Curated annotation (Swiss-Prot):
Its EC number is 2.3.1.181. It comes from the Bacteria. The keyword ATP-binding does not apply. Keywords: Acyltransferase, Cytoplasm, Transferase. In the reaction, the free carboxyl group of octanoic acid is attached via an amide linkage to the epsilon-amino group of a specific lysine residue of lipoyl domains of lipoate-dependent enzymes. This is Octanoyltransferase. Catalyzes the transfer of endogenously produced octanoic acid from octanoyl-acyl-carrier-protein onto the lipoyl domains of lipoate-dependent enzymes. Lipoyl-ACP can also act as a substrate although octanoyl-ACP is likely to be the physiological substrate. It comes from Hyphomonas neptunium (strain ATCC 15444). Pfam families: LplA-B_cat. The active site is at C181 (acyl-thioester intermediate).
Length: 234
C-alpha cells in the first residue's frame, strides 16, 4: 500500500455552528487546492440540526420547524446532526490519492467499519445504500438493518470536504423529523453504538476512528488546534 504524507487532525470539544464549520471547510479545501495547505480531518459535534444534500426531496423533511435546516451542498439527501454524534469532516487531496471517487467513498465506509470493529460491532456496506449498516434481524423475524453512520462528501477540483457522521449516543428520536437519507422502507432504521449496548465516550470513539483512518488511508494523523472553538445553544 502506498503511504501518504501526514494529515492534520483537529478535535473541537464544544458544539460548532454549522455555518461556521462550512466556511472553514470551504476555505481549507481552497487552500489545499491553491496553496498546497496540509490536508485536514476535523472531529466535532453540531447542535441539533438537519442538512439537505443535493438530492434532498422536500417531502422527506417531515418536521421543518423542529430544528434549523441547512443546505449543505454535499451529495446525498437529508440527515441529522447533533450532540452524541461524531462528525468527521475530511479535507483531502483526492487527486493525489488516485482520482477515483468511488474508491474514495469506499475508503470512507471502510474507515467506519474498521472503527466499529474495535467495539465488536459488525458494520457493512450495502449496494445502493451509501453509509454503514448493521444487521438487526431478530431470530425468526423479517430482515431488518439500521444505519449507524452516514457519508456525504463534495469534491471541488479533486479536494474533498464534508465527510462522515457516526452515531455514538445521539437522541435517535431527533431523526424522526426527516426521512434519513431518503429511505422510507420500514426495514431500514437508524441506530447508534449506545442503542447497540456499547456505552463508550466520544474520546473512545475518537481513538478508534483515528487508528482506523491511519490504516485505511495510509496517512499518520498529527494533532493540531481546532479551526473553530466555542459553544452554541443546544
Amino acid at each position: 500500500m502506498q503511504n501518504f504524507p501526514p494529515v492534520e487532525w483537529a478535535v473541537s470539544d464544544a458544539p460548532v455552528p454549522y455555518e461556521a464549520a462550512l466556511a472553514v471547510m470551504e476555505a481549507r479545501a481552497r487552500a489545499i487546492r491553491e496553496d498546497g495547505a496540509p490536508e485536514l480531518v476535523w472531529f466535532l459535534e453540531h447542535p441539533p440540526l438537519y442538512t439537505a444534500g443535493t438530492s434532498a426531496r422536500i417531502e422527506d423533511l417531515k418536521d421543518p420547524a423542529r430544528f434549523p435546516v441547512f443546505e449543505a451542498g454535499r451529495g446525498g439527501q437529508y440527515t441529522y446532526h447533533g450532540p452524541g454524534q461524531r462528525v468527521a469532516y475530511v479535507m483531502l487531496d483526492v487527486a493525489a490519492r488516485g482520482r477515483d471517487v468511488r474508491a474514495f467513498v469506499a475508503h470512507l465506509e471502510a474507515w467506519i467499519i474498521q472503527a466499529l470493529a474495535a467495539f465488536n460491532v459488525e458494520g457493512g456496506m450495502r449496494d445502493g445504500r451509501v453509509g454503514v449498516w448493521v444487521d438487526r434481524t431478530e431470530p425468526g423475524g423479517p430482515p431488518r438493518e439500521d444505519k449507524i453512520a452516514a457519508i456525504g462528501v463534495r469534491l471541488k477540483r479533486w479536494v474533498s470536504f464534508h465527510g462522515i457522521s457516526l452515531n455514538v449516543e445521539p437522541e435517535l428520536d431527533h431523526f424522526t423529523g426527516i426521512t434519513p437519507c431518503g429511505i422510507a422502507d420500514p426495514r431500514y432504521g437508524v441506530t447508534s453504538l449506545a442503542d447497540l449496548g456499547r456505552i463508550i465516550s466520544m474520546e473512545e470513539a475518537d481513538i478508534a476512528l483515528k487508528a482506523a483512518f491511519q490504516q485505511v488511508f495510509a496517512s499518520p494523523l498529527v494533532r493540531v488546534d481546532p479551526p473553530v472553538t466555542g459553544s452554541v445553544p443546544a
